[in-house]
Regions:
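Short, linear, compositionally biased motifs with a strong N-terminal bias
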Residues: 18-20, 38
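Positively charged n-region of N-terminal signal peptides that target proteins for export
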Residues: 2-3, 12, 23-29
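Bacterial N-terminal signal peptides
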Residues: 30-41
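Extracellular/lumen-exposed scaffold segments
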Residues: 47-293
């Protein structure tokens, strides 16, 4: 494929998401540009606890919720991405190429925050680049936090994601719903419950990582996992102006080590929070935060 256009470098992120999709998800993408597909899901006034489907070239997308908020003032839902065969979408940090899913809820009523969570990704090399994500339909859990838990809420979300085959289509659409309008929908609740069950568990001593001494340009971690070490993979999300290359695995003295090039980093190392990682194996997956290198 010729490198005619670099659509991802020219796409505008959702408002408030500029940091989230800085260079880590916009590099090296060889695609034929169809342009961003922008629109509203058909027939989707905020009258249902789930939105209508929005149809695109490579699949369709909708928001589904389990209805009313829980005691903590949170509404649980999923960004439901139904991919056509041969199409793919991306993890929170796609790798060499791609656009991660994003959601902007600034137009919503009584919604303070929306947090996307990600099932364990797979690593792929399709001949155009190495990427982390999903090559089959996937439901990404979303947790909506209410500003005032005792007040009604409506969700009016701008969703932005990449759906790719041999071409990449940036999809941006508005999905609206009223979580309280159908709070006892068993089908929606089951979909949300199933999606939550796919998430990685918390890292633990026998299934997780230990950060080893590295340098300004290299992150090194030792991975611990039950079962076959050959199946283990390590994914790290470049955020806060960090950008990482593909991890290189090595085994020595019975220890599994991943060495990750740091391609870009902030001028000052952040002191709050950390970087998301996921460790996968044939036995399952765990995730956590590691200190900023």
């Amino acid at each position: 494929m010729s490198r005619k256009y670099d659509t991802c470098r020219n796409m505008k992120p959702l408002r408030g998401q500029e940091r989230a999709i800085k260079s880590p998800v916009m590099r090296y993408l060889n695609i034929v540009a169809l342009g961003a597909v922008v629109g509203l899901a058909a027939g989707q006034p905020a009258e249902a606890s789930s939105s209508a489907w929005y149809n695109s070239e490579g699949g369709k997308v909708r928001l589904v919720t389990s209805g009313k908020p829980d005691e903590a003032g949170k509404i649980h839902g999923v960004l439901d991405i139904a991919l056509k065969p041969g199409w793919k979408t991306y993890w929170r940090d796609p790798g060499d190429a791609g656009v991660p899913p994003q959601i902007d809820i600034s137009a919503s009523t009584n919604i303070a925050d929306a947090k996307l969570s990600f099932p364990p990704p797979q690593r792929h090399d399709d001949g155009y680049g190495k990427w982390a994500g999903y090559d089959r339909p996937v439901s990404l859990p979303v947790t909506f936090t209410l500003s005032a838990p005792d007040q009604p809420a409506t969700i009016d979300a701008n969703v932005f994601l990449g759906i790719c085959e041999t071409i990449c289509i940036p999809v941006q659409t508005r999905l609206s719903l009223d979580p309280a309008s159908d709070p006892n929908n068993a089908t929606d609740a089951a979909l949300v419950k199933t999606a939550l069950a796919t998430l990685p568990g918390p890292a633990r001593s026998d299934f997780g990582i230990r950060v080893l001494p590295g340098d300004h340009e290299t992150l090194i971690v030792e991975a611990h996992s039950p079962g076959d070490a050959e199946s283990v993979d390590f994914f790290i999300a470049g955020e806060r102006d960090y950008m990482f290359g593909a991890p290189v695995r090595s085994e020595k003295d019975g220890k599994l080590v991943f060495t990750v090039p740091i391609l870009d980093r902030p001028s000052a190392t952040p002191t709050d929070g950390g970087l998301y990682y996921t460790l996968t194996s044939a036995e399952g997956a765990v995730d956590g935060l590691l200190p900023f290198p």
